């Protein structure tokens, strides 16, 4: 099968980051990457676009790294308390979602719910959690679940 060189416009997992030139199968490019706006075809004239995208990504990474360091200082080692409905045996009705944890963390720093790593919470108690603030920076904290 023929391969095509494409320039990624957004980060694609298991493929590359924005601005990277990658070789992919023609069908993958034509049927997925191009329609989703994740890439465009590589041409000699697109080299200038690649350089501009990489410069923009580097500038954004420096800014977000500084923000991530500040957010880590605010979050690291803290305990977030979440109240939930509990049965008499101490089990939750449902569970605690990453979105609920992100809302509870919002007074300290804005975090992406998808970046939070925590075990499934089905009972009251303290649970260790991590949040990836930047590809190189993670913060550890605790989630305390109490009865309403």
UniProtKB/Swiss-Prot annotation:
Top-rank lineage group of the source organism: Bacteria
GO annotation terms (biological process): translation
Single annotated GO MF: structural constituent of ribosome
Listed GO CC annotations: ribonucleoprotein complex; ribosome
Classification via Pfam families: Ribosomal_L9_C, Ribosomal_L9_N
Keywords: Ribonucleoprotein, Ribosomal protein, RNA-binding, rRNA-binding
Cited InterPro entries: Ribosomal_bL9, Ribosomal_bL9/RNase_H1_N, Ribosomal_bL9_bac/chp, Ribosomal_bL9_C, Ribosomal_bL9_C_sf, Ribosomal_bL9_N, Ribosomal_bL9_N_sf
Keyword RNA-binding belongs to the record: yes
Gene3D superfamilies assigned to the protein according to its UniProt record, in alphabetical order: Ribosomal protein L9, C-terminal domain (3.10.430.100), Ribosomal protein L9, N-terminal domain (3.40.5.10)
Xref: PANTHER family: 50S RIBOSOMAL PROTEIN L9
Role of this protein: Binds to the 23S rRNA.
Family in the record: Belongs to the bacterial ribosomal protein bL9 family.
Name this protein carries in UniProt: Large ribosomal subunit protein bL9
Organism: Bifidobacterium longum (strain NCC 2705)
Encoding gene (name): rplI
């Amino acid at each position: 099968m023929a391969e095509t060189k494409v320039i990624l416009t957004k980060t694609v997992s298991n493929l590359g980051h924005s601005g990277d030139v990658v070789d992919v199968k023609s069908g993958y490019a034509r049927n997925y990457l191009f329609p989703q706006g994740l890439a465009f075809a590589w041409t000699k004239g697109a080299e200038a676009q690649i350089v501009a995208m990489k410069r923009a990504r580097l500038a954004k990474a420096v800014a977000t790294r500084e923000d991530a360091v500040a957010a880590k200082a605010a979050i690291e080692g803290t305990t977030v308390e979440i109240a939930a409905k509990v049965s008499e045996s101490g089990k939750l009705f449902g569970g605690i979602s990453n979105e609920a944890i992100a809302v509870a963390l919002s007074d300290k720093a804005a975090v992406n719910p998808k970046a939070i790593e925590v075990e499934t919470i089905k009972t009251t108690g303290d649970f260790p959690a991590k949040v990836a603030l930047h590809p190189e920076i993670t913060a550890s904290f605790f989630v305390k679940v109490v009865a309403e």
